[in-house]
Amino acid sequence: MDTSAIPAARLEALRQCSQSDGGAKLRDILRGADIIRQVTGVDSHAVLVTLGSGLREVSLDQDAWTARGWRLRARLPLSDLPGVPVPTAEGHGGEILSFTVPAAVVFRGEDGVSARGEDRVSARGEDGVSARGEGAFVGEVPVLVATGRSHLYEGLAPTQIVQLSRIAAAAGVEFALLTNAGGCLYRPGGENTSSGVCIPDTARAGATAKEDRWQLGDLMVIDDHVNLSGASPFTGPVFVDIWQIWDRELSAVLSGIAPRRGVYAMLRGPEFQTAAETRALAGLGIDMVGMSTVLEAIALHQLGVRVCGLSVTSDFSFSSAPTTHQAVLKAVRGAFPQIRCAVEALAGLWTQGYSKHCA
C-alpha cells in the first residue's frame, strides 16, 4: 500500500491510533483509502460529508444533487471498505458517494471570510461571515459523501464507528462536515408550542422568545460538544488536545447559511432521554442532543482534519408529545438544500487555500 500521498504527521497519527492492534487496523485503513482511490479515480478528496438521520432518501435522489451542478463520479458500498460497518438504523444509507462539487465563491474582506451561498441572506456577525444568494461558483472540488453512519447503540465498538472517518482521512480529506438530527433542549412555552415552534427558556438563553424561536428543521452550527456517551475512539495512551475540535473558520462559513450556533451533546442511546435527564442536560448549557457525531469529530481532529458540524432540529425534548424515530426522520429531510449549500461553501473555502492539514 502506497502511503506517499499521506502527510507524514497524519500517517504517524494513524499509526498512533492503531497501536493497540499490532497494525492490523492501520492496514485496513490504508487499504480502504486505496479502494476509494481506485473506484473513484481521485487521488485525494478534499471534503468528507456525513449525512445524519433522515437524509438517506434525499441522497438517493440524484436530481437533488445534480440540480446544483454536482457530478457523481462513483458509488461505493460501505461494505466494500475494510472494517466499516453497514448502518442498520432507519434513515441511514450504506454507501459512500464521490462527487465533483462546484465551489461557492469565498473571499476575505476586512471583516473576515465571506461565502456566497444559495437562497439565503444573513446579517454579518461578529466573525465577519455571511452567506449570500448570488450563486457564484469558482472551480470544482472532489467531495466524499457518506449517506449514513453507524452508532454505538447498534452494538458496535467506538473504533468501528470511526473507521470510515479514518479511511477518509487516509484518502486525503482536509475538511469534514458532520451532520446529525438533534433534539432541541430549549424549553417550549407559549401558544405556538403545539404548532411545532420551540420557544426557549429565556432565563437560560439570555434572549427574548420572539428572537429565538426554533422550528423543526432548523440547523444549528456545532460550536462545541459534551461527550456523555462514555466512549472514546482511542484505546491506550492516545492523549489528544480536544479543547477546540470544532474549527472556528469553517463554522463561521456555515453560520452564514445556518445562523444558530450552540453546544451538542452525545448520548449512547438508543432510548431518548427522560424528563429529568433533559432538565439536567439543559442546565449544563447544552442546546442539542443526539447519539452520534462526537466520536467521529474526535477521530478526525486527531488526524489533522478540520471539522465542522450541523445539527438539524428534529424534535423538542421538553415537549409533552413523545418522540418517535419516524417524526425525527420527517423533520430533517427539509434541511437538505442548506446542507448542500454548506458543502459548496466549504469547497469554496478549500479552493482558496484555507486547508491546514497535517504536513
State what each model feature region is.
Residues 234-267:
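Metal-dependent peptidase/peptidase-like ectodomains
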Residues 291-328:
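Zn-dependent metallopeptidase/amidohydrolase metal-coordination segment
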Residues 2-112, 133-240:
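Metabolite-binding pocket within alpha/beta catalytic cores that recognizes anionic/polar moieties
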Residues 256-287, 350-351:
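Active-site/ligand-binding-proximal alpha/beta "capping" segment
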Residues 169-170, 282, 301:
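Non-catalytic positions within long, well-ordered alpha-helices that form the structural scaffold/packing
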Residues 317-359:
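His/Asp/Glu-rich mid-to-C-terminal helical/loop segments that flank catalytic regions of hydrolases
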Residues 174-175, 287, 306:
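Short acidic/polar active-site loop segments enriched in Thr and Asp
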Residues 110-133:
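Long, intrinsically disordered low-complexity tandem-repeat segments
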